[in-house]
Regions:
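Short, conserved beta-strand element in jelly-roll/cupin
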Residues: 33-49
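A generic "binding-loop/recognition-motif" signal
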Residues: 25, 35, 54, 70-71, ...
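Short acidic-glycine-tyrosine-enriched beta hairpin
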Residues: 53-68
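Conserved short histidine dyad/triad with adjacent acidic residue
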Residues: 17-34, 68
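Ligand-binding loop in jelly-roll beta-barrel domains
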Residues: 68-88
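Short, charged/polar surface micro-motifs in flexible loops or helix N-caps
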Residues: 15, 25-26, 44-47
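Short histidine-centered beta-strand/loop micro-motifs
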Residues: 7, 28-34, 50-51, 75-76
């Protein structure tokens, strides 16, 4: 999925205003959760989401949905990543 496709998906699913972000290789986010449903697309590079039941690797074009209260962390892949996300 490219940026235009992600934006179209956010609009079709009545999501909030999207936010883009990126990180360098190996950057990590500690385990946390959100009160709202997060929809996230990886646009460039890769990122691994660490969920309670499994690790989910997103490469460019990948999507992950994180329902409210889903505990997760993440580690950015070796080439960094660029992502876009919104709340649903």
């Amino acid at each position: 999925m490219d940026r235009a496709g992600a934006l179209a998906a956010f609009e079709a699913e009545d999501c909030s205003t999207p936010r883009s972000w990126g990180n360098g290789p190996g950057d990590a986010y500690g385990r946390h959760s959100h009160e709202r449903h997060k929809v996230l697309f990886c646009l460039r590079g890769s990122i691994v989401f660490h969920l309670d039941h499994a690790d989910v690797e997103l490469a460019a074009g990948g999507r992950i949905d994180l329902p409210p209260g889903t505990t997760h962390g993440a580690t950015v892949g070796p080439e960094g990543c660029e992502c876009i996300e919104a709340w649903r």
